[in-house]
From Swiss-Prot:
Pfam families: SPRY, zf-B_box, zf-RING_UBOX. Capsid-specific restriction factor that prevents infection from non-host-adapted retroviruses. Blocks viral replication early in the life cycle, after viral entry but before reverse transcription. In addition to acting as a capsid-specific restriction factor, also acts as a pattern recognition receptor that activates innate immune signaling in response to the retroviral capsid lattice. Belongs to the TRIM/RBCC family. The modification N-acetylalanine is found at A2. Residues 182-195 are annotated as: Required for interaction with GABARAP and for autophagy. This is Tripartite motif-containing protein 5. It is an enzyme of class 2 (transferase).
Amino acid sequence: MASKILVNIKEEVTCPICLELLTEPLSLDCGHSFCQACITANHKESRERSCPLCRVSYHSENLRPNRHLANIAERLREVMLSPEEGQKVDRCARHGEKLLLFCQQHGNVICWLCERSEEHRGHRTSLVEEVAQKYREKLQAALEMMRQKEQDAEMLEADVREEQASWKIQIENDKTSTLAEFKQLRDILDCEESNELQKLEKEEENLLKRLVQSENDMVLQTQSIRVLIADLERRLQGSVMELLQGVEGVIKRIKNVTLQKPETFLNEKRRVFQAPDLKGMLQVFKELKEVQCYWAHVTLIPNHPSCTVISEDKREVRYQEQIHHHPSMEVKYFYGILGSPSITSGKHYWEVDVSNKSAWILGVCVSLKCIGNFPGIENYQPQNGYWVIGLRNADNYSAFQDAVPETENYQPKNRNRFTGLQNADNCSAFQNAFPGIQSYQPKKSHLFTGLQNLSNYNAFQNKVQYNYIDFQDDSLSTPSAPLIVPLFMTICPKRVGVFLDYEACTVSFFNVTSNGYLIYKFSNCQFSYPVFPYFSPMTCELPMTLCSPSS
């Protein structure tokens, strides 16, 4: 009986962590007690201040030393170390006999009197020495299994910690990205605000200048009328001779007096400011960031016309006027050079600084042949291997598209309405476009219908946004000239981004100065051969410079 009591007491003063008698016990708010060393080590490992048994949180300042449990544990140690008590442990608490048998049904050690009692009668029993090895092996296997489970639990714990760290890093990255995007948005807004204020200041300057001039004109007009009034008053108050002297001239002057009204400025004609589309601006900025991920290291190929100069690092080209001109160099389109490397696949992006230049052409070209053969303006077409945009006369931005077939010039805009026959078998209905035979158009009273290629009946409508013009001389017109597509810029680009997607067959141009807005995009490009970056400084001596990502 005494042994059973000791066992119960021992359970009460045993640390749940180390399973030994409590040493310097500390009690938590929940009532559980642990060794001071055990609870401290547990906190360092788990990094959580919670009870290992019930998981109730606690504060370290609330840990209380439990002297009562410490005294009980100390007394129990003394009893367990006593030789007499050690002998009692091996004896039956009920009968006082040695515990020599093991009951298979109850799984307990019993004495020979217990075996004969009603409680264990008919149960299968064995000597403790016989079953000890068997259960030792079972417990050893169980120990190995639990150690493996401990390792698995530690791995799961490590996985949770790793996932926690991963999420923390990901969220921190998202925070950084969000801050960067909003900073970029604020920079965009600051830039837009500055541009709008500059426009308003310029408008104010021009408007006030004109109003001041108008005020001066009105002052002069009032002064001239006052002079005339003073002359009339003097004549009326003077003698007859003074009244009649030159009176016809005075009357004529009076008849010629007409009040000039001041120049007026209608408020409704003023440009109304509209807040920028923030969502659209962010989308544009996102698209620019996406293509900038494909930044290519482009350099200029030294094989170039003598009228151009390339820097030593092969990243800058400029026009240099020559004293002795080659006859073919009189045409001002051929100062272009190619970039390296050649492109046969993938996505590639580069940026070109064109600050303060009054003329330039850039984009993509299919072959080096154009450099040696000095091509004409007609070559600036996708069908000839050029996908380019350019600037001329400081403010005319254009994209170069394929020339429209001549039959497309027969369009109804010229008031000529009739049916015509062309090349014996092509009859077509024509609508307005361009001069020459093209003048058979509605705007010139020519409208007609007919058959084309024996089976195709077509109506041709106007393409008012396009013109066949020479890049340097708008007065010239040629059927083979490229179709010039005007490009309208709210902010003139100082830096132009070029994005080539070889597999998608597209070439896109971005106004980096205007936060990455798309300038123009060529689609369905036929890249049959390797393509090269293309640059032409034209006759402007300011350089074109390839930019680096860091700039």
